[in-house]
Regions:
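Histidine-dependent nucleotide/RNA phosphoesterase domain, centered on the 2H-phosphoesterase fold
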Residues: 1-195
């Protein structure tokens, strides 16, 4: 049986992608060694599956449709710059999201979908963020740069749909293929066939 890399995520509208691209361009002067996330690949990850069997993927689609069909849209502010594991030894560069409460509720609701499909959720606490870049080594201290941008804000993210993506790794970077789109506020839902 074949398996795929997949993840559940909130997509970003092109305007927000463009605003983030501008931030990435500004940061490149200070963080030249970073690999920046391509704007079209920017998203808010809820759950990632390194390997998921096709049969389980189909169960997950059914569960997501049943649980998320009545979800209401909401907005979060894109605010502040940070890094994992921390700004003193960064590996992942991210933009923060506030308030976190509704995102955490959405994470728990989608976690129910995973359990219904026979999957487990990550045991670490959920930390909503937008990954905008990665560093191969954590030898750069970015704490001063990041502290000067803690109050930085750009346009809000309208959380109005959820997409189940397949992630195909390519030499030029990951390709994200939508498999299922659930529109919030009782709007139409789309099931995609990956090719």
């Amino acid at each position: 049986m074949s398996s795929v890399r997949a993840f559940l995520a909130i997509p970003l509208p092109w305007q927000l992608q463009e605003s983030i691209r501008v931030i990435q361009t500004e940061l490149q002067a200070s963080i030249a060694e970073a690999r920046w996330t391509r704007p079209e690949n920017l998203h808010l990850t809820l759950h990632f599956f390194a390997k998921i069997e096709q049969e389980t993927l189909e169960k997950l689609k059914v569960s997501v449709l049943s649980v998320m069909g009545c979800q209401r849209s909401f907005q979060v502010e894109v605010k502040g710059l940070g890094a994992f594991p921390n700004p003193h030894r960064p590996r992942v560069i991210w933009l923060g999201l506030e308030p976190r409460g509704q995102l955490e509720q959405l994470y728990r609701a989608t976690g129910q979908c995973l359990h219904q499909a026979g999957l487990t959720t990550d045991s670490r606490p959920y930390s909503p963020h937008l990954t905008i870049g990665r560093l191969r080594e954590d030898k750069l201290d970015l704490s001063k740069l990041f502290s000067s941008r803690q109050q930085m804000t750009i346009e809000p993210l309208n959380v109005d749909r959820l997409i189940l993506y397949e992630s195909r790794l390519r030499p030029e970077g990951a390709q994200h293929i939508p498999l299922l789109t659930v529109n919030f506020d009782d709007k139409n839902t789309d099931i995609h066939n990956a090719t």
